[in-house]
Amino acid sequence: SILTKAKIGALQSSTAVSGIFDVGTDSDGRWMAEKFKGLVMQLEREANVIAKETRRGKGNYVICSSDVASALAASGMLDYNPAMSTNLNVDDTGNTFAGVINGRMKVYIDPYATGDYACVGYRGSNPYDAGMFYCPYVPLQMVKAVGEEDFQPRIGFKTRYGMVANPFVAADGTGTNRANPYFRIFRVDDIMV
């Protein structure tokens, strides 16, 4: 998946620990909203690194945990009007689209995140301009069966697919872990500074 293939981010000299962005120490600010703007700046820096490594474009979407999305909303930089008509409702069980940062970077919430992280990625306007491709063999197949316990009819659905890396990223198409330049991931620590 994207999260396992992404290169480690937050490698700039301004971060105390490589691969980890600590909101308390790595961003400068007098109060939380200013420190959260430092997190937005780190996302922009990762987007710039993607542009330099791929020569295709800056990162244009973020996959993050719900706490990171809440921090982005608290920074005042996340426009949640496209996502919600009233206000950002960061909820792991609801819609995963949280909003847009600075009018160009879409933010999605990972409902299965166990820790705080952010992954910046790039996908171009062309469907072939991406870091990974979903390749279905059988789009969707319905299977009918009878339950062993109560002999009630059951319906199941299955699909077969493959995930392959962009062939211009990896020569063999397998997508080595932590090597795809279309994605940058880093851990976010100390959100509640």
Question: At which residue positions do the language-model features occur?
Answer:
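Alpha-helical scaffold segments that mediate packing/assembly in large oligomeric complexes
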Residues: 1-45
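Long, contiguous amphipathic alpha-helices that act as assembly "spine/axial" helices in icosahedral shell
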Residues: 1-11, 55-62, 151-159
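Sequence/fold signature of self-assembling virion shell proteins
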Residues: 26-49, 60-61, 67-193
